[in-house]
Swiss-Prot record:
Its cofactor is [2Fe-2S] cluster; Mg(2+). This is Dihydroxy-acid dehydratase. Functions in the biosynthesis of branched-chain amino acids. Catalyzes the dehydration of (2R,3R)-2,3-dihydroxy-3-methylpentanoate (2,3-dihydroxy-3-methylvalerate) into 2-oxo-3-methylpentanoate (2-oxo-3-methylvalerate) and of (2R)-2,3-dihydroxy-3-methylbutanoate (2,3-dihydroxyisovalerate) into 2-oxo-3-methylbutanoate (2-oxoisovalerate), the penultimate precursor to L-isoleucine and L-valine, respectively. GO terms for biological process: isoleucine biosynthetic process; L-valine biosynthetic process. Keywords: 2Fe-2S, Amino-acid biosynthesis, Branched-chain amino acid biosynthesis, Iron, Iron-sulfur, Lyase, Magnesium, Metal-binding. Pathway: Amino-acid biosynthesis; L-isoleucine biosynthesis; L-isoleucine from 2-oxobutanoate: step 3/4; Amino-acid biosynthesis; L-valine biosynthesis; L-valine from pyruvate: step 3/4.
Length: 617
């Protein structure tokens, strides 16, 4: 009989009480011989990306039981960043990542679970589950709830695709009528699923697919499509298979740390750069690498950004394509296929199918596969009806988008840009680096300089933008919004979208030690490290200072003399306990957020907790 981890609680005379409790959950004598597989669900009625996951949990549970496992489901919390954004609720979003990861560890280890299937979707939940899987290192399979269909509105001569960001942009435009804004509001988010652009949720689900912890198609197959149900069933069968393979055959290749190794992280980051994904993914990959003891740092991302082309353009970088269009073009596997044709990937990395990347692409890249089922899956398209029911439609595109010259996904030779969609900048203003999403920036803005307008909070900056205090050429500096200084590293979607609504998004820059929503576009530079609260130079910027940004040379520079900089450091340190803290900011910080801030490191470390501040156990 195999020695499952769960035997700790299901075998032996001294575990009679535990077995009695297990029986009260429905387990039988036969079940005590099988692996206990956790369904780590994140169903929530607060989040459209999670509203349908209760039904998903039931499908997975039934399939696990059918194939010889004992399914046990529990839920994590889930915060909707879009609803939490623009007010104090956003302070809680990033800290929830650590809370979710910890809660998974608690449940899994307390009950000696053998393996887990992670049912996630939105911004902080997928990263948290990824971190937990690497921390626990038990067989794990990921399956997301799937992307939302893009919204649609009819104009005079055509139908236009829209998404959540359009609703925010138009909501900040005083020239738009209430009726028009209502029309956008009613159309922007038409179905269940993660928001339809390549925002943080979809970016992370695509990266998990590239890493190899989910099945092909997971990142782009729509939540509403009937094929998504098949994916859930396949994922359930897969977790049973790899669980038994590990415990019965001692196959350690199926463990998360062996699948998600440095080469896999590099492949995932290459995908991210190639498709211009959310800058938040960098934060989460760095945090996950720490959990898995993977030597993957900001410098690795910087090196990749110098050689990976931008070959896939998706909203918010364009209004032509959404994630449903990426799927039609072949999804994650097609993007990886194009990179592989240019020898930009490590082909020997393995996944939960037990295949290396080379074999996986041969089967799942639409430009090379002969598998009819794979081709059929990538034909899955949007139903076009408002619904929160998953698997409720079976629409298929008439043909796939295989256009490597002018299509959604292009070849290296026909790339949107030879420079990738994400870049790392360094300089005296960001000694440890900062991140910019170059996918949405016109090349003529790659070199930009202007006078600083400094704000101690996002709210203060928003007020300045809406009251007309920002003019073309300004560099807006929002500081003390980092992991520690916020605390919680708020997303700056509202400042950037309000700039867009008044047509200043291409004429101004915005830099911050906070972060940006996956929906952000324009010359927006975030994750400045060290952050202001950790004695970063951004804390010393003054109104009118010249700030120079050079994306070509990957630099960001506060243009003052070394002497002046040293004088400012001395002046700041002289403030004592008030040094490196925001002036006159009124913000209610709860005990929970203060506890998070106490341990939080800057963004270049993934905003993880500082081990040096923990007790030495």
């Amino acid at each position: 009989m195999p020695k499952y981890r769960s035997f700790t609680t299901t075998h032996g005379r001294n575990m009679s009480g535990a077995r009695s409790l297990w029986r009260a959950t429905g387990m039988t004598d036969e079940d005590f011989k099988k692996p206990i597989i956790a369904i780590v669900n994140s169903f929530s009625q607060f989040v459209p990306g999670h509203i349908h996951l209760q039904e998903v949990g039931k499908i997975i549970s039934k399939e696990i039981k059918k194939y010889g496992g004992v399914p046990k489901e529990f839920n994590t919390i889930a915060i909707d960043d879009g609803i939490a954004m623009g007010h104090s609720g956003m302070l809680y979003s990033l800290p929830s990542r650590e809370l979710i990861a910890d809660s998974i560890e608690y449940v899994i280890n307390a009950h000696c679970v053998d393996s887990m299937i992670c049912v996630s979707n939105c911004d902080k939940i997928t990263p948290a589950m990824f971190m937990a899987s690497l921390r626990l290192n038990i067989p794990s399979v990921f399956v997301s709830g799937g992307p939302m269909e893009a919204g649609k509105i009819k104009t005079k001569d055509k139908t236009k695709k829209i998404d959540l960001v359009d609703a925010i942009i138009h909501g900040g435009d005083s020239n738009k009528s209430d009726d028009f804004i209502r029309e956008i509001e009613l159309s922007a988010c038409p179905t269940c699923g993660s928001c339809s652009g390549m925002f943080t949720a979809n970016s992370m689900n695509c990266l998990i697919e590239a890493i190899g912890l989910s099945l092909p198609g997971n990142g782009t197959l729509l939540a509403t499509h009937i094929d998504r149900k098949k994916l859930f069933k396949k994922s359930a069968r897969n977790i049973v298979k790899i669980t038994k393979d590990y415990y019965l055959n001692n196959n350690k290749n199926v463990l998360p740390r062996n699948i998600a190794n440095k080469e896999s992280f590099e492949n995932a980051m290459a995908l991210d750069i190639a498709m211009g994904g959310s800058t938040n993914t960098i934060l989460h990959l760095l945090a996950a690498a720490y959990e898995g003891k993977v030597d993957f740092k900001m410098s690795d991302i910087n090196n990749l950004s110098k050689k990976i082309p931008h070959i896939c353009k998706v909203a918010p970088s364009t209004n032509l394509y959404h994630v449903e269009d990426v799927h039609r073009a072949g999804g994650v596997m097609r993007i990886l296929g194009e990179l592989n044709r240019s020898n930009l990937l490590n082909k020997k990395t393995e996944n939960i199918l037990g295949l290396n990347l080379e074999k996986t692409l041969k089967k799942y890249d639409i430009l090379s596969t002969k598998n009819k089922n794979v081709i059929k899956m990538f034909h899955a398209g949007p139903g076009g009806n408002r619904t929160i029911k998953p698997f409720s439609q079976n629409y298929r595109w008439n043909k796939l988008d295989k256009d490597r010259v002018n299509g959604c996904i292009r070849s290296h030779e026909n790339a949107y840009s030879k420079n990738g969609g994400l870049s790392v900048l360094y300089g005296n203003l960001a000694k440890n680096g900062c991140i910019i999403k170059t996918a949405s920036i016109d090349k003529k803005h790659y070199i930009f300089s202007g006078p600083a307008k400094v704000y101690e909070s996002q709210e203060e900056a928003v007020s300045a933008i809406l009251s007309g205090k920002i003019i073309a050429g300004d560099v807006i500096v929002i500081r003390y919004e980092g992991p520690k200084g916020g605390p919680g590293m708020q997303e700056m979607l509202y400042p950037t979208t309000y700039l867009k609504s008044i047509n200043l998004d291409k004429q101004c820059a915005l830099i911050t030690d906070g972060r940006f929503s996956g929906g952000t576009s324009g010359l927006s530079i975030g994750h400045i490290s060290p952050e202001a609260a950790n004695k970063g130079i951004i804390a010393l910027v003054e109104n009118g200072d010249d700030i120079q940004i050079n994306i070509v040379n990957k630099t960001i520079h506060l243009n003052i003399t070394e002497k002046e900089l040293n004088l400012r450091i001395i002046k700041e340190n002289a403030k004592g306990l008030k040094a490196y803290k925001p002036l006159n900011r009124k913000r209610n910080i709860s005990f929970a957020l203060r506890a998070y801030a106490h341990f939080a490191l800057s963004a270049d470390k993934g905003a993880i907790r500082n081990k040096k501040k923990l007790f030495n156990f």
